[in-house]
Amino acid sequence: MYAAYFGLKENPFSLSPEPRYLFLSEQHRDALNCMIYGIKEKKGFVLISGDIGIGKTTICRSLINLLDDSVETALIFNTAISDLDLLETVIGEYGIAIISGSKTKKNYIDVLNDFLLRNFAAGKTAVLVIDEAQNLSHGVLEQIRMLSNLETETEKLIQIILIGQPELNNTLILPALRQLNERITVRYDLKPLSSPEVREYIQHRLKVAQGPGSLQFTKGAFNLIYTFTEGIPRRINALCDRALLIAYTKNVSKIDRKIVKLAVHDIGINYFQKTISSGRKIWSRLTT
């Protein structure tokens, strides 16, 4: 709606994950490198954790785009599944044909093992990426551990990347999942963007959208955006999108503190408020 007004070819602050807009902060780059390292070195498991909206899914999709034809990839986003559903989904993602009537756990594992052995013989690497892994049941997590038992004498046949919110770490330390937890040797916990990175992030997205044209963000606006969003990319997108819409309706091309405050009021302070103490701090910034 406002893109043409600001000389942009598209909305730079969409909430949908878009690899073209990937902003690699130092931490995001480290997380991506951890996944690549785990795959190349055949570590078996990689765990990437981080808060909601921090960019985990975008990094996941970017990883897939970086992998070449020597890597066979299965990607799972729906994690409200049973252990049998998991196996069926993995097999489907790899494009393995299953004979009707043979949909049992044993058959699924046998078929998958045959595929992985052929894949290994062809010099290829099989990767299973599971996003939103914090939603997996204990039974499914145990089944994932069992998949890592598929191996040759020298290496694991499948490399598994678990991506999830911080509570996944709390789940993995439970006694029932001790064996799985001990197998995960490559881990990275994503943190929010710093204040300078928030500014770079916004400028990066405007550049990708073929901007900024006449659009300007003041230093005060950048500072307030960081304060309200706490460096979480999804919140930054939501706040900037609303700020640009307000600027468009007011026929102005500068995003300043006033515009940012109006955007926060429109979205609602509760969207940005994580705790009572932080909420008081944010409310103070909003009313001054």
Predicted feature locations:
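Conserved AAA+ ATPase "SRH/arginine-finger" region at the nucleotide-binding site
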Residues: 76-80, 171-172, 185-198
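Conserved NTP-binding/hydrolysis module of P-loop NTPases
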Residues: 11-13, 70-72, 84-100
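C-terminal alpha-helical "lid" subdomain
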Residues: 209-288
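Mid-core helix/loop region of P-loop NTP-binding domains shared across ATPases and GTPases
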Residues: 82-85, 97-143, 152-156, 194-198, ...
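Conserved AAA+ ATPase "sensor/coupling" helix adjacent to the nucleotide-binding pocket
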Residues: 92-95, 166-167, 175, 193-212
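Walker A/P-loop nucleotide-binding motif
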Residues: 41-63, 79
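Short regulatory helix/loop adjacent to the ATP-binding pocket of P-loop NTPases
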Residues: 62-66, 168-183, 192
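A short, basic N-terminal segment
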Residues: 1-41, 281-288
